[in-house]
A protein has these predicted regions:
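Conserved SGNH/GDSL esterase-like catalytic core that processes O-acyl groups on lipids
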Residues: 2-6, 11-105, 144
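Alpha-helix N-cap and loop-to-helix initiation/capping positions
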Residues: 21, 91-98, 135-145, 178-186
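Short, well-ordered beta-to-alpha junction loops that form the rim of enzyme active sites
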Residues: 79, 123-125, 164-166
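Surface-exposed, active-site-proximal loop segments in enzymatic domains
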Residues: 84-94, 128-135, 174-176
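Hydrophobic positions in alpha-helices of CheY-like receiver
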Residues: 106-110
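A short helix->loop->beta-strand "cap" motif at the edges of active sites that frequently abuts
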Residues: 114-118
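Substrate-gating cap/lid alpha-helix
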Residues: 127-164
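Histidine-centered active-site loop/cap adjacent to the catalytic His
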Residues: 176-205
Length: 205
């Protein structure tokens, strides 16, 4: 039996309905990954939205304390949607050069904490820009730039990339719960893509 650790924002964790953030509620892909890998892997994840890269860097220490880190075979990880968020017309929450640095630090911490794990990084998913509020925005052009930055700094380290951006960009609006999150069907499709990468990591180990 393999051991898998999922790190990610509300695309993984799920989201409750919140009109202030135009969120309709989403199960996240994490629950489906756990179901799909039942019998072949124990799937662990923080009971927390892992948010932006610096938040993940800080809380990896706490999340790892609940596990036996040396026994984790695969870490599937994402940060990005919080990092590209623009509030009240401001620049992205995390400047892209800082994002690159934070991803490298998160990678180093994952490598230290989970020394035997294969690391997979999931690219951030696409959004429906026209459904967003003008004072709380994400742009696919930003997401694409940050995804490219992630590949630029992580691929040379041997990190496997899971292109959930391309998967989600092909979705029609019926698979979305809101402008950012996905409904049951959309989350399940993402989960299948996550499981495919995780299973490939078993073979490569």
């Amino acid at each position: 039996m393999k051991n898998v650790f999922l790190i990610g924002d509300s695309i993984r964790f799920g989201a409750q309905s919140n009109p202030d953030y135009q969120t309709s509620g989403s199960p996240g892909y994490g629950v489906y990954v756990k179901e799909m890998l039942k019998g072949e892997a124990s799937v662990y994840a923080p009971d927390d939205n892992c948010r932006f890269a610096q938040y993940t860097l800080r809380y990896l220490y706490d999340w790892a304390k609940e596990l036996d880190p040396a026994k984790i075979d695969v870490v599937h990880w994402n940060n990005g949607l919080w990092d590209v968020l623009r509030i009240n017309g401001d620049e992205p929450l995390t400047p892209i050069d800082v994002y690159e640095k934070m991803l490298c630090r998160v990678y180093d911490m994952i490598r230290r904490v989970f020394p035997n794990a294969k690391i997979i990084f999931a690219l951030s998913t696409a959004v429906i820009e026209e459904w967003a509020r003008p004072d709380f925005k994400r742009y696919n052009s930003d997401i694409e730039k940050y995804n490219e930055a992630a590949k630029r700094v992580l691929c040379p380290k041997g990190v496997v990339i899971n292109d959930l951006y391309t998967v989600s960009a092909a979705f029609d609006n019926s698979l979305h719960a809101d402008w950012v999150h996905f409904n049951d069907e959309g989350s399940e499709i993402l989960a299948r893509a996550v499981c495919e990468k995780i299973r490939s990591a078993y073979v490569e180990r």
